[in-house]
Amino acid sequence: MNPAAEFDLIVYGATGYTGRLVAEHLAQRYGVGGEVKWAMAGRSADKLAQVRDEIGAPKDTPLVVADASDPASLRAMVRRAKAVITTVGPYQLYGSDLVAACVEAGTDCLDLSGEPNWMRAMIDQHHAAAQASGARILHSSGFDSIPFEAGVWFCQETAKAQLGGIVPHPA
């Protein structure tokens, strides 16, 4: 985590459907200048301001312009936050540079990816550097992960019922 950051949290992709819902929740729950310092981020300041107004967020809600096709803008954005929630997908097209920027800055990153091959690639590429920088990268923190989580739960319940407990992972 980036302890000297200006914001606790930046919602990247705040003008999209899911990002808008996240920003609306934060606006209702925390307002601006409260216990959680947060900002809305996306490609267009005008669209961010429009969404801010539509969701009823305070006029002084910070807006950060960053573009997935501009790695320098992503690096500048993530340096301002302790954590980034990104709703900008598909992640295999738009998420890799953001993960790299977060790892470099020591900024936590949470995504909604349901793209296992991309997640594996990000882990393989960035795990050691993330450990060194203190960045925590949390993939698949949304609806797309429900089928996987339900599958794991089903396997655990089946193992408990048929084998009397969860089968330990081989070391």
Per-range role (PLM):
Residues 7-32:
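N-terminal Rossmann NAD(P)H-binding glycine-rich loop of SDR-like oxidoreductase domains
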Residues 12, 41, 87, 112:
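The conserved SAM/SAH-binding core of class I Rossmann-like methyltransferase domains
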Residues 64-94:
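Conserved Rossmann-fold cofactor-binding substructure of NAD(P)-dependent oxidoreductases
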Residues 31-47:
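Conserved glycine-rich Rossmann-like NAD(P)H-binding loop of the short-chain dehydrogenase/reductase
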Residues 51-59:
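Short, conserved SAM-binding/catalytic segment
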Residues 90, 99-119:
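ADP-ribose/adenylate-binding Rossmann-like module
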Residues 138-144, 148-171:
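Conserved anion/nucleotide-ligand pocket segment
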Residues 113-135:
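Rossmann-fold NAD(P)-binding glycine/threonine-rich loop
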